[in-house]
Each structure stands twice: as C-alpha cells, then as structure tokens.
C-alpha cells in the first residue's frame, strides 16, 4: 500500500498541525500550498466583482469611521464602533482585528487599540478590513488630527515618495 501524504497549508497554525500529525502518525506531511496557491490566484469575473464589493463596503466604512474621530476619543472606543458599521453596510464583520493607532502608536504596525486618547497634532492610522460574501478587504489610511507640524509633513512626503517609487 502506497505511502499516504497529507498536504498542509503554509498558514496552518501549529496548534492544529501538531495534533493532526499525532493522530495520523503513519502519514507523511508536505507543504500543500504550492498546489493550490496558483489556482487561488485566478479569479473569475464573479469573484472579482465580490472582491470589489467588499472593498467598496470598506471604502464606505472608512468614511463613517473617520467621522467618529474626535479629540479625547480613545483608540479602543473608535475600534469598537467598526464592527457595527460593517454590519450596517452588509458585511459579516472584520476580516482581521482592526488597528487604530494615535500618535507614537501609529509607528507600530501591529499595535492593538488601547486607551490612548487622541490629541491635537497626532498621526491617526487605521488598518481595517471587512468580510463580505466570504471575500475580505484590507485598507490602511494615515492622516493628521488637525494640522501636521513641519516635521510631520516632511516625513509624510518622504514616505509618500518612497511608496510611489516602490510601485513604479
């Protein structure tokens, strides 16, 4: 009887993989992602439309999300409102834990919203996404609360130019 091989996704967490390997010790395990990644990259017209719809919902949510921002609000207060906004717009919820960062926290790409309060001159960063019809959106936006300082403008322009050069 030929050896059985189980293909495993590259993102499968160890807490799932280890018990699977223990339960099926007679099988060999191999990375299965290359066999499906190429197929997943090809999207039908219908899938592309669903992806665009999820992104459009995220665009609408971002407009409403920015309207919630006010001096003295905490990152956590703003982040907690997002789930309801997504549901009102027809999404089933977040596609990942939202990142809402004020001030120095905006420099941490994996910052989790906390009780930091927004104050004049802060950088505000939103990294949010929704799940709609099993498709996910992801959007990051950075803006300044009130007017940026000269140094903030300089850094912003440097990052913007680097981003544009990277996409050219």
Predicted regions and their residues:
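Active-site neighborhoods and metal-handling regions in enzymes and metal-associated proteins
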Residues: 1-168
